[in-house]
Amino acid sequence: MVCEGKRSTSCPCFFLLTAKFYWILTMMQRTHSQEYAHSIRLDGDIILGGLFPVHAKGERGVPCGDLKKEKGIHRLEAMLYAIDQINKDPDLLSNITLGVRILDTCSRDTYALEQSLTFVQALIEKDASDVKCANGDPPIFTKPDKISGVIGAAASSVSIMVANILRLFKIPQISYASTAPELSDNTRYDFFSRVVPPDSYQAQAMVDIVTALGWNYVSTLASEGNYGESGVEAFTQISREIGGVCIAQSQKIPREPRPGEFEKIIKRLLETPNARAVIMFANEDDIRRILEAAKKLNQSGHFLWIGSDSWGSKIAPVYQQEEIAEGAVTILPKRASIDGFDRYFRSRTLANNRRNVWFAEFWEENFGCKLGSHGKRNSHIKKCTGLERIARDSSYEQEGKVQFVIDAVYSMAYALHNMHKELCPGYIGLCPRMVTIDGKELLGYIRAVNFNGSAGTPVTFNENGDAPGRYDIFQYQINNKSTEYKIIGHWTNQLHLKVEDMQWANREHTHPASVCSLPCKPGERKKTVKGVPCCWHCERCEGYNYQVDELSCELCPLDQRPNINRTGCQRIPIIKLEWHSPWAVVPVFIAILGIIATTFVIVTFVRYNDTPIVRASGRELSYVLLTGIFLCYSITFLMIAAPDTIICSFRRIFLGLGMCFSYAALLTKTNRIHRIFEQGKKSVTAPKFISPASQLVITFSLISVQLLGVFVWFVVDPPHTIIDYGEQRTLDPENARGVLKCDISDLSLICSLGYSILLMVTCTVYAIKTRGVPETFNEAKPIGFTMYTTCIIWLAFIPIFFGTAQSAEKMYIQTTTLTVSMSLSASVSLGMLYMPKVYIIIFHPEQNVQKRKRSFKAVVTAATMQSKLIQKGNDRPNGEVKSELCESLETNTSSTKTTYISYSNHSI
């Protein structure tokens, strides 16, 4: 304000502020006005505010520090460049000039808040009724600029602080660099928009990168503040939602770290050595100091850095720390270098850029010189000539956010342009409706803009004021002592990554691992650690289980076993008893010998059918018995043959039939002998049914019971084959086999043989009863010896057969035991009953002659005398009894000796 009267620059004005807020504002404007230039001010019809980090943070007690050439001056000049371009464009805001009021935030949120109060001065009503000049005249106030919109700020923490003030006064704000997800909250920051995507998109891209590289165990590192903490929070939330990525630990870098703080952070990160990947949402200075600490602790090649856009493709954080940073994957919003700005900025000089109040300071910093006696550089520095040129006498590279600053300014300009078209149709310049711009109405136009930005990409906003996510993905690589940030992919709602272009420490192209637990081998399932789904122990799927998925094993079906990797099931091999097996060779050999011997006996008996020995043996029952013996040998071949329906049918029929033939014939013989001698003790009348025809009827009646039982078995359970997978289901699935066999259970087998065993036992009983019959009269004793031996064989068979029920060799042992037992039984019968007769027929034909027949009366006499002498047997030796019986018989019959008894005509 100025006072009328004396027009001197030192006109004293005394006034009393009626608003404390305004007093604070005024004092703030004067603070450090001598040390730092306050702002850039360009007049125009519509004034836009600008917030840029021209200076870094100052030390304690000092708000501002060193000049930031790129982030400060480059971005600031980008806004001025955009304003110039818009004001020169006849098609954009024609006849309307944009002005600016640009302030320095000094990279500090609290200082930026103080500065931003400048933007709301015009909206604060002031009561100056009590303010008087020294001469009593009322003061004249300089009218503050009415700010229609604000471009900025850069840091998310600064934008959040400023947005809280601007929303109260309904001033739209467009940021060119703030990416904190918190700013997407349209209920709290409803007047905030941005031309850069929020960190939620960036976090999604980083999660996709981590997932694509197969990393599931990572640590996070954030600078304290909205940018770092919100970015890490977004990454954590997204990784939790999609699953598959676990956070080993989260570290935070304090705003004002103590000495040694960064070394402590690195050591804490090393406590989880498997979490090599580190997700970084940190500012540039913190990134540099973290890399320094890692280098100091000699951790080159250990950490796999994933940096946010604050790292991007900057050289400063990795300068002199290239080996530590090698392989770092960084992300940056897709951008392009603006050629027009390069030409503009290179042409800036001290003479043509006086509107930038910080440009002189930039000039000194950029060229390393001093401007006159008022320069801020030390006195021993060379003086600036003013003839220096940017990019000729100094290095120059366009700062990465220049494109977004220009797009932010153009977004505001297009919104104003569209607003003017609707509110002031056909009006040249500002119409009355736009003299005072309604911020809420302008916000609607901002959110509706859609144009191609300075890089040719569309500029749009969603309902929360966020720009779409478009990122370039870089990797810091070292090749032949040269370094570069190489583009390895991009992200636009989904990841496109060229893994083959990636290079890691020591020039390795195979990407390293960052996992809590190594992948389980095939056939192993994961047993996760409680609360840490990315960490697990591997458990092998044991027995007949196979790996269904990563977390579970399941049992294979009964007819299958796990494959070699236990990742699936395969059919269990089917086996049967093969002819070449040792278990089959021995029974077959015995059976063949037995069949040959039996055939030889039958042929011999047929050849000498009418000789006394054959006739005395009872030809009819002998042939029945020999048939049974033959069948007992033959069953071996049926038991070893490959099972099918026909073979199974024959097995059922002949399994017990051979024994039934044999023991039915023997039982009939022993029963006949027993009845004859028992009848002889009582009377001289011959017992009934002792003729050959009667004997055959009895024998076949006994055999018919077996056949009837087999017939019932056929009806109840038709024969068929099965594959028994339980018989050889060993503990080791590799040895498991399915056994192809007939569906004959052990119980069915016992039932089939049970009747024959019953005949055998009965026959044995009769053999015992007739053991005292004189051997010159009958075959009782050979039959008895046969039955005793047979019983011993079958008593040995039972424990062997049933004792191997759980053995893996069950099929072989049981089949061999059964066939050998039947062959041995047949061999005993053949050897004891017929081989002596064949021997006499072949080698002693002189004994095969007709002897005097014994009448039934002689048998009765022998039986009676035997009965009497048995009573004396208790007092005499066995030999004496036998001798006396023989002598008595010889005297009674007037014969010297009779060896065989004739059964013809009821004689013995």
Swiss-Prot record:
Glycosylation (residues): N95, N298, N452, N480, N565
Disulfide pattern: C64-C106, C246-C534, C369-C384, C424-C431, C516-C535, C520-C538, C541-C553, C556-C569
Residues on Extracellular side: 34-583, 642-647, 717-746, 804-818
One GO CC annotation: synapse
Binding site for L-glutamate: S156, A177, S178, T179, Y227, D309, K401
GO molecular function list: G protein-coupled receptor activity; glutamate receptor activity; group III metabotropic glutamate receptor activity
BP GO terms, sorted: adenylate cyclase-inhibiting G protein-coupled glutamate receptor signaling pathway; chemical synaptic transmission; synaptic transmission, glutamatergic
Role, per record: G-protein coupled receptor for glutamate. Ligand binding causes a conformation change that triggers signaling via guanine nucleotide-binding proteins (G proteins) and modulates the activity of down-stream effectors. Signaling inhibits adenylate cyclase activity.
Recorded family membership: Belongs to the G-protein coupled receptor 3 family.
This protein's name: Metabotropic glutamate receptor 8
Organism whose genome encodes this protein: Mus musculus
Gene name of the encoded protein: Grm8
